[in-house]
Regions:
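Core SAM-dependent methyltransferase catalytic element
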Residues: 199-201, 222-229, 234-252
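A short acidic, Gly/Pro-enriched loop at the edge of an enzyme's catalytic core
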Residues: 99, 103-111
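Conserved class I S-adenosyl-L-methionine
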Residues: 1-42, 55-59, 76, 141-172
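A short SAM/SAH-binding and catalytic strip from SAM-dependent methyltransferases
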Residues: 110-125
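A short glycine-rich, Lys/Arg-flanked "PGG" loop and its adjoining helix->strand segment in the class I
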Residues: 126-141
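Class I SAM-dependent methyltransferase SAM/SAH-binding core
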Residues: 45-100
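Short alpha-helix
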Residues: 182-206
Length: 252
């Protein structure tokens, strides 16, 4: 997690509200898809991979699911553990790569989910999808939302619309922050959906939706923002979908 992102998460304090207001934890059509395909989450087993700020984990725990939160970052998990204790949420925190899920049993999970910012850190999406397929119960769902791949090629500015790179250029891209080097990926739709299908999962629903105005300003989940940025005449990128949401099922 970048220092800017961490600062915003600390300032907005929305993690305290997620258990009672799960809509704060999900963008795109993720929460409606969870409700449509998974129904009442009480007593069901949910696994959040690449859990990051753990908003989704807190929300699912508030929905009375038995939640396992998995992330590669020990620091992220420790922050989330302290917050979960404060909120009196029962969540299992596991440090693991998303492409191994080594402590999660086969055929044991009703819902796997991942949220915004997950796939930029994933070098082999197909390896992740195979693990998701393995841990899901037959009939279980993997539901994810992330920034739509169509947003990745552009420079981070409202106007003029300028490309920063070709859509086909997926990385790895080197990032350096506070002396730490990391690598990110900008996967295309085909890079995500083809290996998802190859894993054996079946896509039941796909949504490509717009974002709130705040999306075009900063990383905050807070409401409000400059509504003019939702007009593609002022901000051409807003004419493209901002979020990709997918619901995929492991066959019965």
């Amino acid at each position: 997690m970048s220092s800017d992102w961490q600062k915003l998460r600390d300032e907005d304090g929305l993690w305290r509200l997620c258990p009672a207001q799960p809509e704060l934890a999900f963008e795109g059509e993720a929460l409606p898809m969870i409700r449509r395909y998974c129904g009442d989450m009480r007593g069901k087993r949910a696994c959040v991979i690449g859990s990051g700020d753990n908003y989704a984990a807190f929300a699912l725990a508030g929905m009375e699911a038995h939640v396992t939160s998995i992330d590669i970052s020990a620091r992220q998990l420790e922050i989330a553990r302290v917050r979960a204790d404060e909120l009196r949420l029962q969540i299992s925190f596991v440090q693991s790569d998303a492409d191994s899920l080594h402590l999660v049993e086969d055929n044991s999970i009703d819902l796997v989910c991942s949220t915004n910012g997950f796939f930029v850190w994933i070098a082999e999406p197909g390896a992740v999808f195979k693990q998701v397929y393995r841990v899901l119960k037959p009939g279980g769902f993997y539901i994810f939302y992330d920034v739509h791949p169509f947003q990745r090629p552009w420079k981070d500015q409202a106007a003029p619309l300028e490309m920063a790179k070709p859509y086909s250029e997926t990385g790895p891209f080197e990032q350096v922050e506070a002396g730490q080097v990391s690598f990110e990926f900008n996967w295309r739709l085909s890079d995500l959906l083809n290996p998802l299908l190859d894993s054996g999962l079946v896509i039941r629903r796909l949504a490509e939706t717009q974002a709130k105005a705040r999306f075009w300003q900063d990383f905050s989940y807070e409401p409000s923002g400059d509504e003019r940025l939702l007009d593609w005449h002022n901000n051409p990128r807003s004419g493209l979908p901002a979020w990709l949401t997918v619901a995929a099922q492991k066959p019965e």
